[in-house]
Every structure is written in structure tokens, then in C-alpha cells.
Amino acid sequence: MNRLLTIILFFLLALGINESQGENVAQGVKVIVIDAGHGGAFPGASYGGYAEKNINLQIALKLGGMIEKNMPNVKVVYTRKTDKHFSKNLRADLQARADIANNANGDLFISIHANAHPKSTATRGVETLIMGESKLETSENEAILFANNKEEFFDMSDKSTAAIVRAHIQNLQFTYGEYSEVMARLVQKHYAKLGRVNRGIRKQPLRVLYATDMPSILTEVGFMSNSAELKYICSEKGQMEIATALYESVKEYVAYVKKSLLIEAPQPEVKPAPAPAPQQQNKPKEQPAAKSSKTYYTVQVMASKSAISTSDSRFGSYKGKVKQVRADGAFSYKYYVGEYADRKAAQAAVPTVRKVFPQAFVIAVKDGRVVTSK
């Protein structure tokens, strides 16, 4: 029972995000959050006198510097720029990193790590993880994962944990899955151009990705347990090449999102010209009452690229009760429940809605469109 309560508590903390989140993709890529994995009391893997936390930070700073120099319209937010931790409790530390990303209204989250094999010095290569659960993991891959900070992963062998996590994974994938996978594929493509061994993209129930409300990846830049790769990822040349590969991936990703917004953006409605007034009508034509342009607040439960029937079974117990509103961007169809005069009242309804839709959050609507409201 205590274990279940702990999982539920983390789940609620993970969802305690800024209410204005959720429009990350629809607004384009304006804020990129770079997370240098580990830090402070959490060194990560250690081989040959080198600590993973330092390698991660050096690459993160190089990547951020490239974006800041060459992409002036994109803001870079770092979870850390020095050797520090946010809590001596690892789970709280991971949550703090996600909180930084969410509070910054991040549009893309990149977590940088290095790998290690507990039993093999020959294993090498690069891989990128996205939020999910793979049923095809080999025992070797699982050994690598759980030897390196098991606490960073949800234990999906526990049925209580798995049920909660899978529900949230489904919603994350529905909203951001396409974009996370696109970024992961770009990263692996640019790694491969360097001649690195491509270990591919893997779906894993990572706590830090679970708690971020935006497209997110965690990339493993090489194996510290392999002497050749350790030398490479610790060298200035190796770190610059890795940072450049990530930077080129970011550029392509930003272009991809921009293109998707242009394709998916709703076209302005063409209204027919009003019919001329009859000649015999002398008094001024009566004007219809103006529709209220007052902003109201509601709880968004789902977003989609295409229209969904409000009676769709995916809405569960809210089937037939949800309403549709439009927004700019790729996922322009938003579905919500309830209408409230102020944000506080809408936020009070969120806990109830999250029993069915764990990713639910508050949005503001004006004139039939989702608007940004602080």
C-alpha cells in the first residue's frame, strides 16, 4: 500500500505543471530546455577517473552555446550550468528538472547522458530514448538500463505502478509522441553521420520524460565502459562533434515543426458578402446582438490534428459531454469539459477530470479560440 501511495504521489507531482502548458507544439519552437543528466550528489557512471555528470554538462553547455549563437529566436534554458543537484532524493531531483522545463514553457526537452555496460567493455554506440514502454527489450538492454540508476525508471513489473504509468504514457504519445520520435530519429541520423554505432531509438518509462509536458528525448552519447568511447566523449573533439550533431538535429526539428504548422494551420473562413438591403427599407437595418468576447476557462482533456466526434469512446465517461474548440498549430482541435469564469474555478475541477484524463490542464478560450492567458 505504501508503494502504491508513493507512485500516486509522484504521478500527481508530475502533473503539477504550469496550467498554460500543452500548447508547446502549436506555438512552434521558442524555448529549448537542455538537461545535463546527473550532477552534484549524483555522479552517474564513473570510469577511468571520469564522472558522467561532468561529461553531460560539458556537452550540454556546448550545445546550448551553439543554439544561442546561431538561433537568436530560440531561448535556451538549462536545468543546470554547474555541478549541482536539486535534491538528495533522486526522484525529487528528476522531478525538479521536469519542473524547470515546464515552468519555462519549454517546447523541446533534451536530456544528455552517457551509457555504461555492467559486464562488457566491448559494448559501444549511441542511442536515444523516448517516453514509452517496449515489449521487445532484450535481457542485455535491460541489464544496461537497470545497472545505471534503476531509480530513474518506473518498475513496470509492479502492476499498480504500470497501470498508472501506462495511462499517462498513452496521453503523452497522443499529444507529443510524433514530435519526440522525429527529434530522436534526427539525433540518431546525425550520430550515424559521425560514424558512430547506431543503437537506435528505444521507448522506456523514464521518470524525467514522464513529467515533462512537451516533446522530450534522452540521448546516450556513448559507453563509458568502453575505453575507446570513453576517450572520445571526454575529448574536446568528441564533445564538439556530439554537440554539433545535436545542434544540427535541433535545426532540422525546428524546421519540421514550422512546416507542420504551415500545413496544419486552419485557413481563415471565407464569409459571403451580405445581401443588399431592400430598397423600400428606410430605417437602419437592425444589428444582431454582439456575441460576448469575454474570456472563459475550461479543462482540456485531448488535442488532435483532425476532428473527433464528441461521442467517441476515447472520451470515456465524458463521452457526449466534451466540447470542441479550435487553436493554431498542428493539434488544432482541442476538447474540453466545463466552462468557468476564472482560472481558479477551472483549476478546482482539474483533479476530478484527471481521474479519467491524467494529462488534463486549464486553458483559456475567447471568441471560440484557445488563447494564451497568464
Language-model segments: residues:
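Extracytoplasmic
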Residues: 283-294, 305-374
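Active-site-adjacent mobile loop/cap segments within catalytic or ligand-binding domains
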Residues: 166-261
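Short, surface-exposed ligand-recognition loops at beta-strand->loop->(often short) alpha-helix junctions
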Residues: 56, 298-308
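Short, highly charged C-terminal tails/helix-capping segments
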Residues: 259-280
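Structural recognition of the beta-strand scaffold that forms the well-ordered cores
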Residues: 31-35, 75-80, 108-112, 127-130, ...
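Hydrophobic h-region of N-terminal signal peptides that target proteins for export
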Residues: 10-18
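Catalytic-core regions of hydrolytic enzymes
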Residues: 22-154, 177, 181, 240, ...
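Sec-dependent signal peptide recognition
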Residues: 2-10
